[in-house]
């Protein structure tokens, strides 16, 4: 659920009420909760303190199965946010989005490894290709990460029409 599209996301009671409604409607289906900040391609900005409060509300609700925590805006707070989610029994997707380019393979692997070392259950990268070679760069990084850390599943995607093959 993309909470950045929820108008009352900053209202703790409204957010908790909405999460309980989603949990009831979904039954046994998994609920992934995401607040995608504007800096990472989302609907609205959210200060770091507000983002942490959002994560706390999600964790306290007992409704989420997975929580997506953004990597770069929260890098210093990441281990604490992940520990909070894990203490609540919530798996963590740690995400990074680059809408301008595809960084080199080594940087992509470094990012995913840093996410894993911070405690993320599922590192996630979404990057923008400028060429077919960029798509292959992401796929090579994905292969290297899964070879180095087979215990950690990863989510990677190359965006746009050019990256479609990476999203099969």
Feature roles, as predicted:
Residues 1-87, 93-104:
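Active-site beta->alpha loop and helix N-cap motifs at the rims of alpha/beta catalytic domains
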Residues 66, 71-168:
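Catalytic alpha/beta core domains of metabolic enzymes, predominantly
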């Amino acid at each position: 659920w993309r909470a950045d599209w929820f108008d009352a996301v900053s209202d703790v009671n409204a957010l908790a009420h909405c999460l309980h409604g989603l949990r009831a409607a979904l039954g046994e289906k998994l609920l992934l909760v995401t607040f995608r900040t504007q800096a990472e391609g989302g609907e609205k900005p959210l200060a770091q303190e507000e983002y942490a409060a959002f994560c706390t509300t999600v964790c306290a609700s007992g409704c989420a199965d997975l929580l997506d925590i953004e990597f770069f805006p929260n890098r210093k707070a990441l281990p604490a946010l992940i520990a909070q989610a894990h203490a609540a029994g919530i798996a963590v997707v740690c995400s990074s989005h680059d809408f301008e380019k595809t960084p080199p393979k080594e940087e992509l692997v470094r990012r995913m490894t840093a996410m894993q070392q911070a405690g993320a259950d599922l590192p996630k990268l979404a990057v923008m290709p400028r060429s077919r070679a960029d798509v292959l760069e992401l796929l090579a990084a994905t292969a290297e990460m899964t070879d180095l850390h087979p215990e950690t599943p990863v989510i990677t995607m190359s965006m746009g029409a050019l990256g479609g093959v990476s999203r099969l």
